[in-house]
Amino acid sequence: MTIEDLKSELKSVLSNEEAIEIISAYIAEHPDSDEAYTMRGMKYWGAGSRSLALNDYLTAIRINPESRAHLALQASKEILDYRNKDLYNP
């Protein structure tokens, strides 16, 4: 399965939880896919699992420093800083 196949499969998925399961299975087979970690992080964020989302963004950045996870991580930090400064302390 390619990352494009994964994206196509996710188009028919309605819940974040189901998407997380599918992406996690993909990551198990492709542990170096920064894009998959970024996608799962976004689904975790949507499901309310902020710390898991941040961990996935950081993993994606470790795999590929040029990853778009930088944008997701920055947006997450800004949201957390705005909503509750005690929740995230760099």
Please give the residue ranges for each predicted region.
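Short coil turns that delineate tetratricopeptide repeat
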Residues: P31, N64-P65
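Alpha-helical linker/edge segments of TPR/alpha-solenoid repeat scaffolds
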Residues: S12, K77-P90
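Helix-start (N-cap) detector for alpha-helical repeat units in TPR-like alpha-solenoids
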Residues: I3, D34-E35, S67-R68
